[in-house]
Amino acid sequence: MAGVSEAERRGHRKLVRFQARRAIGPIRPTSAAWDRDFDPAGKRIAVVGTDAAAAHYISRLSESAASVTVFTQAPRRVVTGVPLWTTRAKRWLRRRTGAEHPAVAWATAAIDALTSSGIRTSDGVEHPVDAIIYGTGFAIADQVGDQTLVGAGGVTIRQAWDDGMEPYLGVAVHGFPNYFFITGPDTAAQARCVVECMKLMERTASRRIEVRRSSQQVFNERAQLKPAQPHRQTGGLEAFDLSSAATEDDQTYDGAATLTLAGARFRVRVRLTGHLDPIDGNYHWQGTVFDSLPETSLTHARAATLTIGGRSAPARITEQTPWGTHSVAGVGPPPYARSGPASATT
């Protein structure tokens, strides 16, 4: 039977702290905890942040409030070449967020402090305010509530996440079969993923489902490099192992290696993991090269050879991370020793 962690299904509401924070009329904590008795009519309202719900409540506030001032954050990422098909969506957002409404003002200067009469920004401007609405979104918890949760190998969730939470798709963790997390704030997508996993177990008459260590590692490494892609309801299930009992653990190596690239040899530290793919019958391995590599070598070739001890395997440098590390992958016998029944199938 599969279980879902109810305690971790939501992140906590993210509040910002300002200098000299003082009560200035009815301050509304967050847009996620809306007070239905709050009447914005005739009030001077400040909206701090523009979370995902901003397109809905800013437009409604501007209909009756005396004024609405939105204090926005600086862009965290600049994207060039926005697809043309988003033009209609952008127009809709501009209308709903009040970008084209005369009663809505936008303050781009950073907030310096809350005063007895309103908000003072870093440019010295005092903004009179009767109420504040925090649209600062969610801060996902960095640990689970039940630190005593024990997995199949006797490892607690606290030990498994010693360096921070790393669930696959935000719902599954290697070493904790039949157990799912729903952390939020997009609980609907996570719930659909869990339901698909349970349907897969039912179709295959399996009693156990567990995400592969390699899939979890690659997912979390890539999640740090680029914006997350939408999860397709029919996709992602190939990252799970199905069985009626405990399966062989993915093989993992963390240590020294020699990388041969463009005719040059480099002593590097790597962390590699892999699994035998039941569909194509090949062993797929991948991981991280933690040492920096010369740009001149990378411009000449991406194909490489990775050697660990007396074992060598063809590899490919797939991408470079912002931290100077490189992702490496290969198909076939890996450069590290494997144990268990799977080692005979290479």
Curated annotation (Swiss-Prot):
Residues 321-346 are annotated as: Disordered. InterPro entries: DUF4873, FAD-bind_Monooxygenase_sf, FAD/NAD-bd_sf. GO terms for cellular component: plasma membrane. Pfam families: DUF4873 (PF16170). This is Uncharacterized protein Rv0943c. It comes from Mycobacterium tuberculosis (strain ATCC 25618 / H37Rv).
